[in-house]
Curated annotation (Swiss-Prot):
Species whose genome carries this gene: Synechocystis sp. (strain ATCC 27184 / PCC 6803 / Kazusa)
Additional remarks: This function is generally fulfilled by the C-terminal part of HisG, which is missing in some bacteria such as this one.
Major localization listed first in the record, in broad terms: cytoplasm
Protein name per its UniProtKB record: ATP phosphoribosyltransferase regulatory subunit
MF-aspect GO terms: histidine-tRNA ligase activity
This protein's encoding gene: hisZ
Length: 401
């Protein structure tokens, strides 16, 4: 058992680490250009913090022993932890642009023993900022992130949790949860066979199922519904967002509007979205996010609400997608200098010269030979590892062999 990681865990070897570090570094540079600052929150949180007032199922959380003050868990996502940190320590009501790179942990569904439990994400949160401009910034930043990574063939699936819930609220309360479940599972057959009180309710449920397609198609279908009050306002806001993103000239090239789609985490109150890429026979969910205007109140001492929005990018999915495209390095960075003593009397001089090279060339890799290999073996090793130069060192400094 000790020879392998536990089920659901895995090790990352140097090449994969280097590839994912490149992805992370490019994302952090993009976040920085947009004015976002990095925040680091605890991997370990109170379970009550992680479930976000019931918006996240406790079954998703890997829970630890009771500390004596309450149950603990490993974060299944970052938004709740960041919301808790910001609302208790950064509440000056000014827009806070925060970014992160971190691991998250999720219990696999029942019956999926051995399924991956640790994931890596990078993302941003824009807090204390409501309105269409903030939502547009999020979508445009997401687009910029994927563009900087060299991804062009991807699709943005955009929904609106608030609008979808408002439409669901027109159905009988006893059917709302079942209709939502059918729509989430894309089960049209079961949806059409539910015990509706009348044809009007059934037609509305089936129309909700069909609210996905191009922007023009979905807005046209919305126009045929009898929308009033809150629904009309939410549609106007959605149209304003779409217009602003289009007017920027830098929005996603392929946008699908899906008002039947709901995120698995229930704290979203406005726009929700996924970035998806299809490569060969694989479909990759590159990232997801949305607006959550009620979440921060869960952590405020007086339950005061503040707006928030953001997204997370899935490093594993990005990594697999970029591997298929062939845009990631296929080997680790080579050694630039292999520094070798000519004999035992040169050991001290070898260490000194290696350190001198590191100071002179801080971006270069300098490796020290630790002995036990002949000059011929060192030359063979250097060729196999694409070493830039072997430096031989005698007691008085570098020498030619």
């Amino acid at each position: 058992m000790i020879h392998h990681p536990p089920a659901g865990a895995r090790d990352l070897l140097p090449l994969e680490v280097a590839q994912k570090a490149r992805i992370n570094d490019q994302l952090q540079q993009t976040f920085h250009r947009w004015g976002y600052q990095r925040i680091v929150t605890s991997t370990l949180e109170w379970l009550d913090t992680l479930v976000a007032g019931g918006a996240i199922s406790a079954n998703n959380v890997i829970q630890l022993q009771d500390s004596g003050e309450g149950r603990l868990g490993l974060r299944p996502e970052l938004t709740a932890s960041i919301a808790r940190a910001v609302v208790t320590r950064m509440t000056d009501n000014q827009p806070q642009r925060l970014c992160y790179r971190a691991n998250v942990f999720r219990n696999p569904p029942e019956g999926y023993h051995g399924k991956q439990m640790e994931f890596f994400q990078a993302g941003i949160e824009l807090l204390f900022a409501g309105g269409v401009r903030a939502d547009a910034e999020i979508l445009l930043l997401l687009t910029d992130c994927l563009t900087q990574l060299g991804l062009s063939d991807w699709q943005l699936i955009l929904g609106d949790a608030g609008l979808t819930r408002s439409l669901l609220a027109k159905l009988p309360p006893t059917l709302q949860a079942t209709v939502r479940d059918c729509i989430t599972r894309l089960d049209y057959v079961e949806l059409s066979q539910l015990p509706y009180p009348d044809n009007e309710a059934k037609n509305l449920a089936l129309q909700l199922f069909d609210l996905r397609g191009t922007v023009e198609e979905v807005l046209a279908r919305l126009g045929k519904l009898d929308l009033q009050g809150e629904c009309l306002g939410l549609v106007d806001r959605l149209q304003a967002l779409l217009c602003l993103v289009a007017a920027s000239g830098d929005g996603p090239a392929n946008l699908v509007l899906d008002l039947s789609w709901l995120q698995p985490f229930d704290y979203y109150t406005g726009m929700v979205f996924q970035a998806v890429s299809r490569q060969a026979d694989n479909c990759y969910v590159l990232g997801q996010g949305g607006r959550y205007d009620q979440l921060l109140s869960q952590y405020h001492p007086q339950q005061q609400s503040f707006p928030g929005t953001g997204f997370s990018l899935n490093i594993e999915e990005l990594h697999q997608c970029l591997l298929e495209l062939g845009t990631l390095p296929t080997s680790t960075a080579p050694i630039d200098y292999l520094v070798c003593p000519v004999d035992d009397t040169a050991e001290g001089a070898t260490f000194r010269h290696a350190q001198q090279l590191r100071r002179q060339h801080p971006d270069r890799r300098v490796e020290l030979d630790l002995g036990g290999r002949s000059p011929e073996e060192l030359n063979t090793y250097a060729q196999a590892m694409a070493v830039g130069q072997i430096v031989w060192v005698g007691a008085d400094g570098p020498v030619d062999l």
